[in-house]
Structures are given as structure tokens and as C-alpha cells.
Amino acid sequence: CIAAANAGCLGLCSTFATTSRETNPIVFEDFCKQAHAETTDDDVTIFKKMFTRVFEETKESDGIFGANVMVSAEVKANAMKVMQAIKELREADPEMKRRFRVLVTTAGDPMPWANFVKEQGMIWMHVFPGVRTAARCKKAGVQVLIASGHEGGMHTAWQPVHSMTLLPDIIEKFSDENTLVCGTGGFCDGKSIAAAFAMGADGVQMGTRFLA
């Protein structure tokens, strides 16, 4: 997240690892280490420390960053804690509010989060694997639709619909002057990004590529 924001991309912080506190302590401990938090901290405090670290280490570049939050019913409690941390940090510091401006929701229904995003005035993106959720995104007021093909890491699609099939369909049905469409899943180099632009996409989301 920090490296991406400092390079001029949108840096996104993952927020899912706190759910592994009991089930996968190694993952949880590493997450806390990266967040500059203690394993004894409560989840909201861990998120605050992580976002604050990103904020501090992107000051020189004036980097823009955001949070990626899974919002499915199974992890709603974790999502609520993330939202609490976001709200409290942004309301306490105008500069934090200016640069911590993006919320990416994923793996669930965007509709229940519409009021929160509207109140916070954040740029809202949602990652989804099909047309039905894209329609929910439009109804909820999501500003950037991120169509996730079957190639995507941690994809949530039940059907193997790939990016080159899904993305142009979403662009045709939902792209307009108020809604941007990006692709994710399999985009990893200049050629694949150019392909997304050729299909009419406004951008791409990449994650695994930065670990390869």
C-alpha cells in the first residue's frame, strides 16, 4: 500500500487478517507487525495504527490511499470495526481525510454501506464477479465498478467467467458519465492493461502482481 501510494498509484490496505486472530495466529502476528501494532491490541486499534503508518509514510509523496474491506455477512463484524477506525481517524484529522479518501468494498452486497460512504464523502469502489452485483452497485451509488474475472486472487465468483468476457459486458451495461469501470484478475503487465483500455475500461486493479 505504501509503495503503491508513493509511486503515484492508489495504495490499498487489506483489512481481513484480523479475522485470523484465533484461527491463524501466524498470519495475524505478521499483520500486526506490518501495521506497527501489538497482538494484544483490539481490532479497531490495529486498524488505526495501520492506517496511521500508511499516512505517515506517504506524507512526502502526498500519496492517496484507501482501505479494501470484505463486507459479506460472514465478516460483517470485522467490516464494522474497519469502518469505525476509518470514521474516527478521518474526523480527527483534515489531512488524513484528504488523503485517506477511498473505500473499496468487496465480497458482499454494497447496499448496506451506502449511507456510511455518503456520510464520509469517500470515493467508493466495489469489487464483484457478475452483472447482478454490478446492478446493485449502481443502485447503491458506487462510483467505480471493479469487475473481477475468474483469474483474480481471492476471487468470489461461483462461475468461471474470465476477465476478457466479464469486463466488456460490464462496460457496455453500466459505464456512464457518473460511473467508472475497472477490471481486475489477470492484469499484470503493460499488454494486459492496454487490453483493458482497448475494451473501454477506465483502469485496472492489481494485487498479486506486486508480490510476484
Spans of features found by a protein language model:
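Active-site entrance/lid segments in N-terminal catalytic domains of soluble metabolic enzymes
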Residues: 1-177
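Gly/Ser/Thr-rich loops at beta-strand to alpha-helix junctions
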Residues: 110, 187-188
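Conserved active-site-proximal phosphate/metal-binding subdomains
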Residues: 155-180, 188-212
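Short hydrophobic "strand-cap" motifs at the C-terminus of beta-strands
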Residues: 184
